[in-house]
A protein has these predicted regions:
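Active-site-adjacent beta-strand/loop module that shapes the phosphate/pyrophosphate-binding cleft
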Residues: 73-103, 137
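A short coil-to-beta-strand element that immediately follows conserved catalytic motifs
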Residues: 59-68
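Conserved Nudix-box catalytic region and its N-terminal flanking loop in Nudix hydrolases
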Residues: 17-58
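A generic structural micro-feature
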Residues: 2, 80-88, 108-113
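Conserved N-terminal beta-strand and adjoining loop/helix that marks the start
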Residues: 1-19, 66, 91-93
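Charged phosphate-binding loop/patch that engages nucleotide di/tri-phosphates or the phosphate backbone
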Residues: 130-152
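NUDIX/MutT-family hydrolases
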Residues: 105-138
Length: 152
């Protein structure tokens, strides 16, 4: 089994919209929170800043920790190829340092990433957003409890 991986994610909200990366697979489009793996000797907040530059091309200011989510691959719909993955994800409230700057893919977008999109809260139920449980919490304005466990 692989070792447990830490990941820092950004929750960026503006005018009842959530900034997400737009991705495409064989099925359709899906949306993810910007962020990714923590590197050795890197603080989680620094990982969130670096990952946002890579994925959304924007500098962010990292605020409070909102959620801690575990992803245990064997328990989710992608178990066929993710069964040995165990990741602990830390979701931070972030804000854009330059909110009026042009938005688009960053300097190193993820493999399936095709763009960046401000998604209105009322659309979060209509799209594939991962993890969907956190999309629902944010849509409802619920920012607790911090530890949410292995939710999809």
């Amino acid at each position: 089994m692989k070792s447990i991986r830490n990941s820092a994610k950004a929750v960026i909200i503006r005018d009842d919209r959530l900034l997400l990366t737009k991705n495409k697979d064989d099925e359709s489009f899906f949306y993810l929170f910007p962020g990714g793996g923590q590197e050795k000797e890197e603080e989680l907040k620094d990982a969130a800043v670096r990952e946002c530059m890579e994925e959304i091309g924007q500098e962010v200011e990292v605020g409070e920790l909102l959620f801690v989510r575990e992803y245990i691959g064997k328990n989710h719909q992608f178990a066929e190829w993710d069964s040995d993955v165990h990741q602990v994800e830390f979701y931070f409230r972030c804000s854009l340092k330059h909110p009026d700057a042009a938005m688009g893919n960053g300097i190193h977008p993820d493999e399936h990433q095709v763009g960046v999109e401000w998604v209105p809260f009322d659309r979060l139920r209509e799209i594939r957003v991962y993890p969907s449980a956190l999309g629902e919490k944010i849509r409802s304005g619920v920012f607790g409890p911090c530890y949410v466990g292995d939710v999809g």
